[in-house]
């Protein structure tokens, strides 16, 4: 694909995303305004929530970059960040595969081999889901399943994470059947997969910290605990992510989050609705602004060719 054609595709994606998100923001802002609540959010806690999300992005970007390097490729962190944020806009196009596909194409254009470009994107997507489940279930098991099940559940999920290097090829074949294309993952050092799992797990915890800062800022008081906040956010995010028909998980994530807020003692009624709607606006803005900024501020550059790392 020529440079001009690729830029056209990118800007077409931007237009679709902005139109979709703008409509959702307008609708949800109206719903927020109609709530029978007086909200005076803490600016410092809101800033802390944004900082925690950006920190989780930094961890995820480093994790993906590390996976690319494990394939014997080279990719600078700045290039990895640009690819990550711009391709993230594809989450707001129905089908979810746009994000993984865009990440692979952009990495290849940055000089990464096609196998490593697509393979690393798929690895991170799969490992991120496994790590998210491994974070959400133990944290929520105490209240959802009973404290006696926390240790067995945590042990089982830990084994699943350790088995990730062997589970990935199976998951890739399943993804291939879903996408109707050959999705084979070449051999990857087990250590690289485990590092990816740890990185994704840390990112989920940072997401939980960010979400807790947000709902404490909105309510003006601390409710629930950090474990419940992390479990509620992670579980609802994964439900939205796995709903292929929902762009950005919008609608599905909110449907899942509401009951979890009440279950973990965070909020109920109008306050739960406030957190659900505000968190969608908060997350949408944080997800799309960096990608748009990278597109607008990107300086023309030549395509580089990767060489195996020493």
Where are these regions (language model features)?
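Predominantly cytoplasmic-facing regulatory/coupling regions of multi-pass membrane proteins
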Residues: 1-83, 132, 138-242, 263-310
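Juxtamembrane transmembrane-helix termini in multi-pass membrane transport proteins
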Residues: 65-68, 104-105, 118
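Mid-bilayer segments of alpha-helical transmembrane spans in multi-pass integral membrane proteins
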Residues: 88-97, 125-133
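Re-entrant/interfacial helical elements at transmembrane boundaries that shape
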Residues: 97-110, 245-263
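Hydrophobic alpha-helical segments and helix pairs
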Residues: 114-141, 155
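Membrane-interface alpha-helices at helix entry/exit sites of multi-pass transporters
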Residues: 77-82, 99-100, 108-125, 267-278
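Transmembrane alpha-helix interface/packing and boundary motifs in multi-pass membrane proteins
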Residues: 86-93, 234-254
